[in-house]
Regions:
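Secretory targeting signatures
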Residues: 1-34
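Bacterial Sec-dependent signal peptides at the C-terminal "C-region" and cleavage site
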Residues: 22-41, 342, 346-357
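C2/C2-like lipid-binding beta-sandwich modules
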Residues: 33-80
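Short consensus segments that form the blades of beta-propeller domains
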Residues: 59-75, 228, 278, 407, ...
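Peripheral membrane lipid-binding modules
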Residues: 69-152
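C2-type phospholipid-binding modules
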Residues: 127-202, 456
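Extracellular calcium-associated, cysteine-rich motifs in secreted modular proteins
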Residues: 200-302, 307-309, 313, 318-359, ...
Length: 490
């Protein structure tokens, strides 16, 4: 009888414990498990994934030194990537003869110990050599020197926080998840510099990307519920953006007034443009490109693809990351404008009103995007700023320039003109070189302002897709330092 009573008591005790567990909130149970265990995520077996998002060779002819920056002298690069996670090496396929890889579609995943917080990650960018010579390690590191350690990137990833530090970190000059080989000061030096975008994440039970440990120990959210889109502190920005960029999603911040990188975009606008790669701690330059439909005879008024790539390279290597909405984006605002053989100033204003603002003077793009339209021909000039945030270039006039001087490069002509007018929206108005007496070799200004090697100088506008750094004496100007990223909002 005593044995039966003892068994009955044990069963009742077990049942009560079961009920207690069943009614206890899931997040509270998980918090107890975390604090009493070395497992940083008891819901899953943790794997860490490094995803390569974009690669760009900074291959460009620089007027500043009359030399070409390149990765492979004989051809476009044959890029491939090596990723090392906790000493386990992964190698991507080779992307042959490609300077710009916008969708590599490659990642490396490694299972890691669930009870060790820090994971070592190395990223290397290589140019394959099919001639029998050794493959070349490209420079994507901020470190100086010529050793392999000064070219690859070494990171430490935390499975506790979901963030990493090392050669790339939150708030660094090139941006989080973006590597720039020119960060060592080698912009106008030949060091096989390149740009590489990447992300690191880990297995996450609820799929919101926020690690279990952060949800349970910092935010008090349920690690079994996807919290994407939630804004519990009601500051206008969701939890996943605030976590990613190091803000506290449980404490309201004045994101409408915060602009830590002073690029003119407040944090609400940085969040809205994050789908296109913006970073609240690194300067971004957004430009909407509208273009004109072909003429009845088939003449086009578009910005050449090669010009776009030159613009990306020129801005990106200076860590002013260029975002050109040319119609290829998801959520694009770019449009094709009906053909007009001769566009008056008043018609330019109408184009801006109808195709950029769309009649809405509170359009969210106003104050976020510059507006640069390619028309067939202006009635006044082949390129000009017609408002603080807007400008045009005329394809017909630029094609005539190419026809008159055949040795000029068409991509450079368009790229230089587009960058020149963008410069005015950045408040670059140089004293020298930007006048009617400096545009041709038979003019005195051409020779006097030769040290100012910038597309803002009429003597270089069609041969240079770059601004000057002011390093060539008294008759030079530092456009990069003098520009005002907020001027277009005036």
């Amino acid at each position: 009888m005593q044995t039966i009573r003892k068994k009955t008591m044990m069963l009742m005790t077990a049942f009560i414990l079961f009920l207690l567990v069943a009614v206890t909130p899931f997040s509270s149970v998980k918090a107890t498990l975390t604090r009493g265990s070395d497992d940083f995520d008891p819901l899953v077996d943790i794997s860490v994934t490094v995803t390569i998002d974009k690669i760009r060779a900074f291959d460009k002819f620089d007027q500043q030194l009359m030399k070409r920056e390149y990765v492979d002298w004989n051809s476009d690069p044959d890029f491939f990537v090596k990723v090392i996670i906790n000493d386990q090496e992964f190698t991507s396929p080779v992307w042959p003869n490609m300077k710009y890889i916008n969708d590599p579609n490659w990642s490396a995943t490694c299972n890691v110990p669930d009870d060790v917080e820090l994971v070592n990650v190395v990223i290397q960018l290589w140019d394959a050599n099919d001639t029998g010579a050794p493959d070349k390690l490209c420079d994507i590191s901020p470190d100086t020197g010529s050793t392999s350690d000064s070219k690859d990137v070494e990171l430490t990833y935390s499975i506790k926080t979901g963030h990493w530090t090392g050669d790339d970190a939150l708030g660094d000059p090139s941006g989080y998840g973006r590597l720039n080989g020119d960060d060592d000061g080698s912009i106008y030096q030949h060091q096989s510099d390149a740009e590489l975008w990447f992300t690191i994440n880990q297995t996450d039970y609820d799929g919101d990307g926020i690690p279990y440990w952060m949800e349970v120990n910092e935010y008090g959210t349920d690690p079994t519920v996807n919290n994407r889109g939630e804004d519990t502190d009601a500051d206008g920005v969701p939890i996943e953006w605030e976590w990613w960029w190091g803000y506290n999603p449980t404490v309201a911040e004045s994101h409408a007034t915060l602009d830590p990188d002073v690029d003119g975009l407040n944090n609400l606008e940085e969040y809205r443009t994050s789908q296109w790669g913006s970073d609240p701690f690194r300067a971004d330059l957004f430009v909407e490109l509208d273009q004109m439909m072909p003429s009845p005879t088939g003449e086009t008024s578009t910005l050449p693809e090669g010009s776009k790539e030159l613009l990306y390279t020129a801005y990106d290597r200076q860590n002013l990351v260029y975002h050109l909405d040319d119609g290829s984006w998801v959520g694009t605002g770019s449009e094709m404008i009906p053909f007009d053989s001769l566009t008056q100033d008043s018609e330019l204003d109408a184009i801006y009103e109808n195709y950029f603002l769309h009649g809405d003077h509170h359009n969210w793009r106003l104050g976020v995007f510059h507006y640069g339209v390619v028309i067939y021909q202006s009635a006044v000039v082949n390129g000009n700023m017609f408002g603080r945030n807007r400008f045009q270039i005329s394809s017909h006039g630029l094609e005539q320039k190419k026809a008159t001087i055949p040795f000029l490069n068409r991509d450079v002509i368009y790229g230089g003109a587009y960058m020149h007018e963008t410069g005015h929206t950045l408040a670059i108005f140089p004293i020298g070189g930007h006048n009617p007496n400096s545009g041709a070799p038979w003019q005195l200004g051409w020779w006097f302002w030769r040290p100012y090697k910038s597309c803002m100088n009429y003597g270089y506008i069609y041969t240079t897709v770059d601004y000057s750094d002011g390093s060539r004496g008294l008759r030079d100007f530092n456009d990069w330092a003098d520009m005002d990223l907020t001027a277009f909002q005036s």
